[in-house]
Amino acid sequence: MQNITQSWFVQGMIKATTDAWLKGWDERNGGNLTLRLDDADIAPYHDNFHAQPRYIPLSQPMPLLANTPFIVTGSGKFFRNVQLDPAANLGVVKVDSDGAGYHILWGLTHEAVPTSELPAHFLSHCERIKATNGKDRVIMHCHATNLIALTYVLENDTAVFTRQLWEGSTECLVVFPDGVGILPWMVPGTDEIGQATAQEMQKHSLVLWPFHGVFGSGPTLDETFGLIDTAEKSAQVLVKVYSMGGMKQTISREELIALGQRFGVTPLASALAL
């Protein structure tokens, strides 16, 4: 019998959650991570599945995700503990045939349930499937320290925030030319914040929750982690720059345009226009 804990997707989740913890982005039970799988990914591990998978209804049907398996982090679980006990802190779930709920096939032992932000994740998965033709498979939420700090001092406007991050590090425009979406402050763990996040995910692979954290989307765990890491590095640079009295010089609009042309990306027009 093959052990599911040695699968690429469980090992990938262990690495991503451990790295995020070591970065300081996921204190206590902060943060959540979901990865969309295919049936072929989980097929070799049926012998590991629960004999009687628990069924949990979704707060709203998501037919686009019907019959789709995911691996998810659990509600109230600490990222730092995933590596110690994957089965207690992670779960493989599969949405039912009409998208009305899901079965917990593996993991989430002792009656644990998926992350409270599952509505935001699933709604965002729906939008990123449409926006990327199914390429994006990962949604990651974490409390990236410097990005959060900037939401207290920068105007919480997509164009303004995006332009500042692009100027904070040359690679940013190349990595997220579509910019950073920003919500107003909202109560987490609700359908409302999930719907607002998904709406921004139609246009942006990064979405900031002011005074709280960031959502990122990408095709792989590495790409999604790297996306957030790149934005957070720029935010760290900006925090240092602002604390030293602000910018004396920076990357110009013309230089940003040249950067986009060199790497074949189209920068967010509203940020470029500032």
Swiss-Prot record:
It is found in: Cytoplasm. GO terms for molecular function: metal ion binding; rhamnulose-1-phosphate aldolase activity. One of its GO terms (biological process) is pentose catabolic process. GO terms for cellular component: cytosol. Binds 1 zinc ion per subunit. SUPFAM superfamilies: AraD/HMP-PK domain-like (SSF53639). It catalyses: L-rhamnulose 1-phosphate = (S)-lactaldehyde + dihydroxyacetone phosphate. Its EC number is 4.1.2.19. Zn(2+) binds at residues 141, 143, 212. Its cofactor is Zn(2+). Signal peptide: none annotated. Pathway: Carbohydrate degradation; L-rhamnose degradation; glycerone phosphate from L-rhamnose: step 3/3. Keywords: Cytoplasm, Lyase, Metal-binding, Rhamnose metabolism, Zinc. The active site is at 117. NCBIfam families: PRK03634.1 (NF002963), rhamnu_1P_ald (TIGR02624). Belongs to the aldolase class II family. RhaD subfamily. PANTHER family: FUCULOSE PHOSPHATE ALDOLASE, RHAMNULOSE-1-PHOSPHATE ALDOLASE. Catalyzes the reversible cleavage of L-rhamnulose-1-phosphate to dihydroxyacetone phosphate (DHAP) and L-lactaldehyde. Homotetramer. This is Rhamnulose-1-phosphate aldolase. It comes from Escherichia coli O17:K52:H18 (strain UMN026 / ExPEC).
